[in-house]
Amino acid sequence: CGDINAPCQSDCDCCGYSVTCDCYWSKDCKCRESNFVIGMALRKAFCKNK
């Protein structure tokens, strides 16, 4: 999985329960710390391979 600022295609590509795949700033998605830690942890729980 990718660390902060790593390229990603979905939240499941990013390491850490609070790290989201952010496509907002450019067309190149990057992993970044989420402001919604609890919600992200719940979403990450559904990632199959991480």
From Swiss-Prot:
It is found in: Secreted. InterPro entries: CNTX (IPR035285). The keyword Disulfide bond applies. GO terms for cellular component: extracellular region; host cell postsynaptic membrane. The keyword NADP does not apply. One of its GO terms (molecular function) is sodium channel regulator activity. Its main location: secreted. Keywords: Disulfide bond, Ion channel impairing toxin, Ionotropic glutamate receptor inhibitor, Knottin, Neurotoxin, Postsynaptic neurotoxin, Secreted, Toxin, Voltage-gated sodium channel impairing toxin. It holds the Pfam family D_CNTX. Disulfide bonds join 1-15, 8-21, 12-47, 14-31, 23-29. Expressed by the venom gland. Transmembrane segments: none annotated. The presence of a 'disulfide through disulfide knot' structurally defines this protein as a knottin. Insecticidal neurotoxin that reversibly inhibits the N-methyl-D-aspartate (NMDA)-subtype of ionotropic glutamate receptor (GRIN) and inhibits inactivation of insect sodium channels (Nav). In vivo, is highly toxic to insects. Belongs to the neurotoxin 03 (Tx2) family. 05 subfamily. This is U2-ctenitoxin-Pk1a. It comes from Phoneutria keyserlingi (Brazilian wandering spider). The lineage of its organism: Eukaryota, Metazoa, Ecdysozoa, Arthropoda, Chelicerata.
